[in-house]
C-alpha cells in the first residue's frame, strides 16, 4: 500500500487478489476532550488544548456522516450504493467485495473472485466529522477566580482544581491512622511514611534518610555548604527559602521596597543571571513581608518585655508561658509540654534514640544543640564572655548562672526554710534534707546519704584509703602514704629530739614542728593557730565555713586570685528593677524573675507565705566591684566572636 499524507487526510491504493484496485481515502482519528467535548482531528492541537486548559462551552451539533462508494470499472458495475448513516452507526455492509472498517483501519473480505477490475473510492470518517476548531494558544495560563489571589498555571484545569482546594478548604484525602486530612493524594502518601517509617531517600555521604526528595535535597546542602537563597539587602544566605523568609522580616519595610528592586545599570540578561539563585518576591509577597517587618507583636502581660516579628504563632507559643497551657502530653510519663518539638525531644529519653553523634569520641546526643555544646569541650571554645570579669563559658546557661554571682540573684527559694539558691538543681538537693529521704546507699556498708556527693566522700574516706597492714583509714592518698612509712623496715631519717624515724626528709621536717613552739598559721576569725597549713584549712572548713564564703577567701597556704584572676567574682551595686508581684521578691536580671515566677506556678499560691523577700536596693555591704548599669547586666547572651 502506497500512502501519502496531504493535510488532514490519508489516501492510498490496494490491489485485491480478485483483480480489483481499491482506492482508500480515510480521515484521521478525531480526539474528543473529556471536559468540554470539543473535537480535534490534529493531535498537536488536542495536546495544546489539554495543557492550556479548556473552557466549558456548548458541544457543537454533530452532522451526520456520509459514506459514498463510487465504482469505476471497465465493464458495467454490478451495483453502486450511496448510503447516509448517522454518527451512531458503525457497521457498513455493501454488495461489492465487503469491507469492514473498524477504528479508522480497513480490512477486506472478498465474497467472490472475478476477472473484472473494479476501482472503488471510499471516503469514511471513523467518528463524527465536525468543523475543525481553533486550538487555543499553548502559552495561555489559567488564573484563579478568587479576588486577591494571583495564582496562575499553564498545566490545565486539574492543576487549577488542586489550587482551588486551598480556598474552599476541601481535604478529601484522610489518613486512616491519625485522621489528618489533605487536599492532595500525594501529600497523603508522603504523610503515611511518618507512620510506616519508610524513608526511601538516603544520603550517599552519611546515614541520613528522608521520606521525600525535597528533604534530602535540603540535607545535601549541609555537605556541600550550598546556600542558594541569598538576601538582596545584606550578605545573608541560607540553605532553604523558609530561613530566608524569616530573615527578611528583620529588615524594615522601607529597606525592602528600596533595595529588593533589580540593580540599576546592569543589562537585563546579566541582572537576571545575578538574581537567579535568590528568592524572587512577588508584589503580594513584598507587601506581606513589609507588613510583617513593620509590625511587632508584643506580650500583653504586665512586666513582660517579650517582642517578636515572626507573627502571631510565635507570640501564641510565648503566651503559654504565662497561661501555663501545656497541650502536648507524654504517653509514658504524663509529662506535659507547651510545644510539640519539646515533646519530640523528650520522647527520645524514653526511646533512647540519640541520632547526633560526636566524631571525636563516643558521645551521642538527642538534639543537635547538645552536640554543639559537647564539641566545644574538644575545641575548648568559650564564646560566652562575662562583661564584668574574665569569666567565659561554653554555653549561655552557664553564663546566666555566673552573672547571678555578680548580682546576688537567688531565684530558687526553699518553701520550708530561708535557703536560697542560684540554680534549680541545688534547690532539689536541698529539699531532700527536709524530706529526710536518703536514696544513696553505700555498696560496702549500710550507710545511706541524702546526697550523692556525701556518698562519694564516705566511700573515699572509709573504703578507699585503707592500710594493708593495719586498720588505718586515711582521708586521701597522702595520708595513706604517710602512714605506710611506719611499716617500712628502714627508717634512715631520725628525729634528734625523740624516737621518731621516717624514710623521707620532708616528713622529718614536718615532724620537727612538734618540738618547736612557733605556730605560724593563724586563723583570721578566731585565736586558733597551728603549725600545719592543712590543719588550719580543716579548722576554717569546719568552724568558719560561712564566714569564709562571705569574704571570698582562699584556703590558707594558697594564693587567692587577684583582681584580674579568672575566678574573681566581684559583687555589683545596682537597682533590682524586676520585682515579683506575688511575694515582693526583686531581682537585677529578668531571667532570674522568670525562674522565680515559675516556682509560683509549680508550687501553687498557698505556699507564698514562706517566701523570703529580697531588699529593694542592691547589696548593702561587701561591695567589691564598681557601679554597673542594669543594661550591662541585661545584655543578650550572644557568643563573642573575638576569641
Curated annotation (Swiss-Prot):
A UniProt-annotated Pfam family: zf-C2H2
Tissues where this protein is expressed: Widely expressed. Expressed in the brain, spleen, liver, and heart.
Family matches, as PROSITE patterns: ZINC_FINGER_C2H2_1 (PS00028), ZINC_FINGER_C2H2_2 (PS50157)
Keyword Kinase attached: no
Region (Disordered): 538-571
Assigned keywords, A-Z: Developmental protein, DNA-binding, Metal-binding, Nucleus, Repeat, Transcription, Transcription regulation, Zinc, Zinc-finger
Segments of skewed composition (Basic and acidic residues): 538-552
C2H2-type zinc finger locations on the chain: 173-195, 201-223, 229-251, 297-322, 328-350, 356-378, 384-406, 412-434, 440-463, 465-487, 493-515, 578-600
Gene Ontology CC terms, in alphabetical order: nucleus
BP GO annotations: mesenchymal cell differentiation; positive regulation of mRNA splicing, via spliceosome
Localization in the cell: Nucleus
MF term (GO), any: DNA binding
Annotated positions binding Zn(2+) 2: 523, 526, 539, 544
Oligomeric form and interacting partners: Interacts with NOTCH1.
Family: Belongs to the krueppel C2H2-type zinc-finger protein family.
Described function: May be involved in the regulation of mesenchymal cell differentiation through transactivation of NOTCH1 target genes.
The protein's name: Zinc finger protein 64
Organism: Mus musculus
Name of the encoding gene: Zfp64
